[in-house]
Amino acid sequence: MYNSIIRMILPIAVTFLLGVLIRKIKLMDQDGCNTLKRLISKIMLPVVLLNAFLFADYNGGVMIIMAVVFVAMLIMFGAGFLLSRLMPERAKYMPFLFTTLECGTLGYPLAAMLFGALGTSHMAIVDVGHTVFLFLIAVPLLQSVDGGSADAKSILKNAVTSPTFDTMILGILLGVAGVDERLAASAGYELYQSVVDFISAPTGMLILITLGFDMSLRKDLMKPVLFTSVLRVVIMGVLCAASCFIIFRFVPYSREQLCILILAFTLPASYGLTTFARFEGHNDYVATTVSFSTILTLILFVCLTVFAYSGV
């Protein structure tokens, strides 16, 4: 068992450190890293997400999970707003770092490492509730705070121009229409799956390299960063326990679903927030908080992997 866990965790650690090394030896500059991110977000992740939403199991339990996750995100935003009063110099953007989940570039690859396609399907259900919160609540509020437009036209534009949102909607529509069953029963299914697997295979590796490359832990920012990151993890832990209790009162328990819910609640704030606001005067704080939260996520993922395969 422990050999299997080490085989799963070691590549993650090595690849993340490889990203740090690439930056240190200047093998790639920030433009190169940004190009990798665009490749991941506009091509590779949409393929992963479309496949996950297409083959997700849409039943009554899905709506419960979506609703619980949405409410949890609202509670986290409220908690961030209240706690931001303790650090007024960072109060403007702190609530946004307490809520949202980086399901796209981190949650799906880690879920796939745990349980393969089943893991990504479970994460997709969690991501629906989160994505609705992101585009209906978080982004409009963020743009309003940042001095931008938060009207209905702006909200709609942000949603329809997001590959994550587009693939989520398309995957759900195709899945509900039964395209997944017809595709799985067709002669072309193996060909389809081989193409999806080939395109999505390096996604996790490339994401970890970019995360390692972007890691920035400035000493002068560590107090607000630690305050935000650690409190986020603690409150998310409490919300995760409450959410799992509620969900499994209505949804049949499965160890895989439990582990994916725990994984989701350990994820850092959405990296996509930086594309919707300037964070003027707070860029370093936001970037460093996300970097540190990502490290915490990877550490907690190690613990989750042990739990997932320990049989406890």
Region annotations inferred by a language model:
Residues 1-312:
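Alpha-helical transmembrane segments of multi-pass small-molecule/ion transporters
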